[in-house]
Amino acid sequence: VISGFYPDSVQVSWKKDRVDQSGVVLHSKQRNDSTFETVSYLTVPVVEWTTGDVYTCEVSHTGSRFNDRISMRYQKGGTVNLPVPGGNTPCTCPPSSCSGCMPKLVYQTDLNVTLENGGQLQYNCHQQACKIK
């Protein structure tokens, strides 16, 4: 989830070990505070995910010169630590009072993974860390 940006001009790209991938970016929605929000995701087969390759989501917003990225990779068992996004504070101002608002990256709080063999894994995410339920 990428939220809190204005104007509605955010670019999202996905990479697997620095090679461009075809991710999905949904149409932006305007929020009550007049900023925008969108969702992007990359579908990765389990056999590829478990090889340990690094997947990166890169977000840029020309209106605010915001650039950030989140990298992740499979880690067997235990805890998966996610980095805190770049430290830029999101702007939640109405469009009339600022020229550009910073987007912020929001982590999914619960993650359900369906394996190709029909099995399922559930993760509970809190404070930038995910643990298997």
Swiss-Prot record:
Pfam families: C1-set. GO terms for cellular component: extracellular region; immunoglobulin complex. The lineage of its organism: Eukaryota, Metazoa, Chordata, Craniata, Vertebrata. Residues 76-133 are annotated as: Secretory tail. Keywords: Adaptive immunity, Glycoprotein, Immunity, Immunoglobulin, Secreted. The keyword Zinc does not apply. Residues 1-71 form the Ig-like domain. CDD domains: IgC1 (cd00098). It is found in: Secreted. InterPro entries: Ig-like_dom (IPR007110), Ig-like_dom_sf (IPR036179), Ig-like_fold (IPR013783), Ig/MHC_CS (IPR003006), Ig_C1-set (IPR003597), Immune_Resp_Modulators (IPR050380). It comes from Heterodontus francisci. Glycans are attached at residues 32, 112. One of its GO terms (biological process) is adaptive immune response. Expressed mainly in lymphoid tissues including spleen, epigonal organ and circulating lymphocytes. This is IgW chain C region, secreted form 2.
